Amino acid sequence: MTLQDKEGTRNTREATLYQRQRAPGIDQDMRLIRFSSPAEMDGSAVLTLENSDRPDDQWLYLPAYHTSRKIPSSNRSDRYMGTDFFYEDVSDDKVDQFEFTLAGSEQQDGRHCLVIEQVPIDETLKKESFYGKKRLWIDPERLLTLRIDFSDKSGVLVKRFTASSPQLIQGRWRLNHVEMLDMRISHRTTIDYRDRKIDQGLNPQLFSVRNLERGQ
C-alpha cells in the first residue's frame, strides 16, 4: 500500500488481509486487515463484519491503547487508517439501500463496461454517507468493477477509484491493483495485492474482537 501526496511524497505500508464468508452460501464477509509496517503501525488492525439487516460492524485496534474501539456508523466517512478510502468504502453496499440506473456503456482500460449510477434511498444512509451518488464502470463479462466516480451531496466529483491487473484465480477474476484518488487534495492511495491464497479454511475465531486485541 502506498500513499502519495500532491508533491509526490510517498509513504509505504505493508498489511495482511484475511477474508471469509460469515456462513456457507451467505454473501456476507468477515474481513481482518492487520498492518506490519511501518514500525509505528505494526499490529494496528481493522475488523469488519458484514450484516444483512443492519450497518456493518467495524472495530479499530491500535496497539498503543491495548484495546479496540468500535467505529460508529455515523463515522463511516472517516478516513480508513489515514488513507484515501473511507470506512464506508471498505464495506459492501447493501442493494436495498440504493436506487440503480443504467446510464449507458463505455470503454474502461480496453474493456466494454456498463455504466451504473447508484444513489442512496435509505434515509439513515443519506445522513451518514459522504456521497450523494456513485457512478460505476462494471465489466459484465468478468464481473469486475473497474472504476467508481464518487460525487458529494452537491453533485461535485470528489474521488475516483480505479482497478486493474486482473487475474483469474480458481475460476474467478480478481483485481490485483487498485487506486483511490481524492481529487480535492490531489492525494492517492494505491494497493497492490500479492501472494493471494484461496480456500485456506480460516477459523471463524480469527475474526473476533478478542483475537483482534491479541494482535494475532
For the regions a language model picked out, list residue spans one by one.
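Conserved long hydrophobic alpha-helices within structured protein cores
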Residues: 9-12, 107-116
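Short, low-complexity polar/charged micro-motifs in intrinsically disordered terminal tails
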Residues: 211-212
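Gly/Pro-enriched, hydrophobic low-complexity segments
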Residues: 36, 47, 57-61, 67-71, ...
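Short, solvent-exposed mixed-charge patches
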Residues: 215-216
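Short amphipathic beta-strand and strand-loop transition segments with alternating hydrophobic
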Residues: 16-22, 99-107, 164-166
